[in-house]
Amino acid sequence: MEDTIHPRYKICVSGAAETDSCGESVLAVAEELGREIVRHNAVLVEGATTGFPYWAAKGVKKEGGIVIGFSPAAGEKEHVEFYKLPTDYRDVIIYTGFAYSGRNLILTRASDAVIVGCGRMGTINEFTIAFEDKKPIGILEGEWETDEIIKLLIEKSHRGDEVKDRIVYESDPKILLDKLIELIEKDKKNHKAMSFHA
């Protein structure tokens, strides 16, 4: 039987489109995260937006990697004129036509894992989708508060036991990717084993 584990994982980077409250280092950290995604032989999947995901996409392209953007718009004109979103640093943009909440669902579901950087409400939405879908999740710690908010959400939801083996926290993008790739590979092996027993 042919091995179905795809050699290039799709890593979603979720983060704030507006980064003013994220601290001075946020853009450099996002760009380095993008570079590390390529160094880990992965593809970046992101919301075809500005801010944290944009700088991650920039890092991916500087390292010669692939970026797939998922837009809330139904087409390029709406993407640029209505949503005021960029098209550069993306190899492919998929126009979902489902606004932000629908885009977030498709974007997250299309990924093998999700990395959460500095974010706002949309980032929390993408995190909760990944959480409920039992995706491997990497929380990038930094001078922002998103990582602390997510820890508090998990604690207050009394669901920490469910995710202790699926969420990793790390401030170094390289180490975060190392840990996240391990989770993806474990997740893929578990799914493959389950499909043989079904």
Enumerate the language-model features and the residues they cover.
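C-terminal amphipathic helix plus adjacent low-complexity
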Residues: E182-A198
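Short, hydrophobic/glycine-enriched beta-strand segments
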Residues: Y9-A16
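Short acidic-hydrophobic, aromatic-tinged amphipathic segments that line or gate anion-handling sites
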Residues: I93-F98, K164-L176
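Acidic/glycine-enriched connector segments
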Residues: I5-P7, T19, L27-R35, T50-C118, ...
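Conserved phosphate- and dinucleotide-binding cores of soluble alpha/beta proteins
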Residues: R109, A113-D161, D165-R166
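A short beta-strand-loop structural module common to alpha/beta enzyme folds
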Residues: V43-T49
